[in-house]
A protein has these predicted regions:
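Hydrophobic transmembrane alpha-helices and their helix-loop junctions in integral membrane proteins
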Residues: 1-160
Length: 160
């Protein structure tokens, strides 16, 4: 995901990017949860699984690598893509905790990320339509000419 997601978000049309951001990136977490509950059942004591030795370090690496890489991006779509990598790290961290609050937080974050990242890319699609590019430098002062769109971008960004 660290490799293909930024390129997929960057080069895909805005409508496709909205779909990718809202649905396809969460499939890995859904499949993992579905597999666990189908194979083991909901009454299984998940503490016996050793997720904390494998999944927990990988989730933490995804969180930090995605966030640090996002800081240095100048293309807004790539920035959002690396942010999604970090967000998926948060979701995997909830699964790796192997307890009810962790799973509840993961499921809540899946829905929140799907709605808000989709909304972010819809607003970004409006910006791309208006400006023709997605660089951070070109967005300077855009809140004066597109206040509602930039308000949606800020609200969506703060909700994640």
């Amino acid at each position: 995901m660290h490799v293909w997601l930024p390129n997929a978000y960057t080069y895909a049309p805005s409508l496709v990017t909205v779909f990718l951001a809202a649905t396809s990136t969460k499939v890995s977490v859904y499949v993992l949860l579905r597999f666990l509950f189908t194979v083991f059942g909901p009454s299984y004591d998940f503490v016996n699984l050793t997720f904390e030795f494998v999944l927990l370090p990988l989730a933490i690496v995804a969180m930090f690598a995605g966030s640090i890489t996002a800081i240095f991006q100048t293309n807004v779509k790539r920035l959002f893509a690396y942010s999604s990598v970090a967000q998926l790290g948060y979701m995997m961290l909830g699964v790796a905790l192997s307890n009810i609050p962790g799973l509840m937080a993961t499921i809540l974050h899946i829905f929140n990320h799907a709605l808000m990242k989709g909304a972010l890319f819809m607003a970004l699609g409006c910006v791309i339509y208006r400006l023709g590019n997605v660089s951070l430098a070109s967005m300077k002062g855009l809140s004066r000419s597109m206040p509602w769109t930039m308000g949606a971008l800020i609200l969506g960004g703060l909700s994640l």
